[in-house]
């Protein structure tokens, strides 16, 4: 999978990032997402693959493109058997977030990326569009921290694993009312809190990569993004756990319809037999071969955003593979207008 699709998925996230970055700082949140979705889908449909969106822009009735269940790739066409090889006809699952952090792009702030993860069929959990409690931590803490532990205990463990004082730790938390108690607990240990308003895939990666200055992600965010984060951190050998949160009183957004009991019954009817299960990264992204790619739209902790020059653009992409146990950073210059070759900046 990596040999046949590795370069292709790089180009998929690059095209989405370039399209969205054109609208950076213009206050056009929905438009920045829309152009990224279209660019990502267009490039996917040029690839010799048989892909199925398992995490995307929503249900079919709510999303015109990259909706859950959509088939993408040349090898989904009726005459695919005549055009595609046996390997290309194998089904793959795809999880996408073409513009992770739409508000960040609209406001010209750091941390937005175009991301996707792929695996063989059944290799990525199709998480319901609910919330998820998440814990991400560096590789040294994998299997030692636990999402059920108090934040105090987890920070003590992380500090010991990294051989540093708790006061040296930085924890990313999404700035939401539901996290008031969590924030107070983190601060009581002496650790520092870094708030984000959006983009917790980027935050999970920052926690899972040594040297970013971030040592944990804690709190509740969107469940689909949790699966994509799990795919990346599983490939990195870092710690990630997630647990569905479906109690409206806990998430405090007003977006969940019905009571906790009603939503629990809906989940069970959809086949989620253990709604309160704690999911490990290896369960959320269980495939034998998992590939993750992220291209910066705006600058982040580990990759730069898109930079535009006369007739060209430069992107930075991170590609992580469970198959080859590699993390690659790809620096690409895109000639957007051949008439301006002389203006190329390296």
Swiss-Prot record:
Binding site for Mn(2+) 1: 33, 57
Gene3D superfamilies assigned: 3.40.190.90, Fructose-1,6-Bisphosphatase, subunit A, domain 1
EC code(s) of this entry: 3.1.3.11, 3.1.3.37
Pathway listed: Carbohydrate biosynthesis; Calvin cycle
UniProt xrefs under Pfam families: FBPase_glpX (PF03320)
Keywords from the UniProt entry: Calvin cycle, Carbohydrate metabolism, Hydrolase, Manganese, Metal-binding
InterPro entries: FBPase_class-2/SBPase (IPR004464)
Binding site for Mn(2+) 2: 97, 100, 225
GO biological process per UniProt: fructose 1,6-bisphosphate metabolic process; gluconeogenesis; glycerol metabolic process; reductive pentose-phosphate cycle
Cofactor(s) for this UniProt protein: Mn(2+)
Binding-site residues for substrate, renumbered to this chain: 100-102, 131, 176-178, 198-200
Top-level class of the enzyme under EC nomenclature: hydrolase
Catalysed transformations (reactions): beta-D-fructose 1,6-bisphosphate + H2O = beta-D-fructose 6-phosphate + phosphate; D-sedoheptulose 1,7-bisphosphate + H2O = D-sedoheptulose 7-phosphate + phosphate
GO molecular function: fructose 1,6-bisphosphate 1-phosphatase activity; metal ion binding; sedoheptulose-bisphosphatase activity
Subunit structure: Homotetramer.
Entry's family note: Belongs to the FBPase class 2 family.
Entry function: Catalyzes the hydrolysis of fructose 1,6-bisphosphate (Fru 1,6-P2) and sedoheptulose 1,7-bisphosphate (Sed 1,7-P2) to fructose 6-phosphate and sedoheptulose 7-phosphate, respectively.
Protein name in UniProt: D-fructose 1,6-bisphosphatase class 2/sedoheptulose 1,7-bisphosphatase
Classification of source organism: Bacteria, Bacillati, Cyanobacteriota, Cyanophyceae, Gloeobacterales
């Amino acid at each position: 999978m990596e040999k046949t699709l590795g370069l292709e998925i790089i180009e998929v996230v690059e095209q989405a990032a370039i399209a969205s970055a054109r609208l950076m700082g213009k206050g056009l949140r929905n438009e920045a997402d829309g152009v990224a979705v279209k660019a990502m889908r267009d490039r996917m449909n040029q690839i010799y693959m048989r892909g199925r969106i398992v995490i995307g822009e929503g249900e079919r009735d709510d999303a015109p493109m990259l909706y859950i269940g959509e088939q993408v790739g040349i090898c989904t066409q009726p005459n695919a058997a005549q055009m595609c090889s046996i390997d290309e006809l194998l089904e793959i699952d795809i999880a996408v977030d073409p513009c992770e952090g739409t508000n960040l792009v609209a406001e010209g702030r750091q941390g937005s990326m175009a991301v996707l993860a792929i695996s063989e069929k059944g290799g990525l959990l199709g998480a319901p569009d609910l919330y998820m409690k998440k814990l991400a931590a560096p590789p040294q803490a994998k299997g030692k921290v636990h999402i059920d532990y108090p934040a105090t205990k987890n920070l003590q463990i992380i500090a010991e694993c990294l051989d540093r004082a708790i006061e040296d730790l930085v924890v990313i938390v999404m700035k939401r009312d539901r996290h008031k108690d969590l924030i107070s607990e983190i601060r009581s240990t002496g650790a520092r809190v870094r708030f984000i308003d959006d983009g917790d895939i980027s935050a999970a990666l920052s926690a899972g990569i040594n040297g970013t200055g971030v040592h944990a992600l804690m709190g509740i965010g969107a469940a689909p993004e949790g699966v994509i984060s799990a795919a990346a951190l599983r490939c990195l050998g870092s710690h990630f756990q997630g647990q569905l949160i479906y109690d409206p009183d806990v998430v405090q957004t007003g977006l969940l319809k019905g009571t906790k009991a009603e939503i629990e019954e809906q989940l069970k009817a959809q086949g989620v037999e253990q709604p309160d299960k704690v999911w490990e990264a290896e369960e959320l992204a269980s495939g034998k071969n998992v590939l993750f790619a992220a291209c910066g739209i705006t600058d982040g902790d580990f990759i730069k955003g898109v930079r535009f020059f006369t007739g060209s653009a430069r992107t930075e992409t991170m590609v992580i593979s469970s198959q080859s146990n590699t993390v690659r950073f790809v620096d690409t210059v895109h000639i957007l207008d051949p008439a301006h070759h002389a203006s190329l900046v390296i």
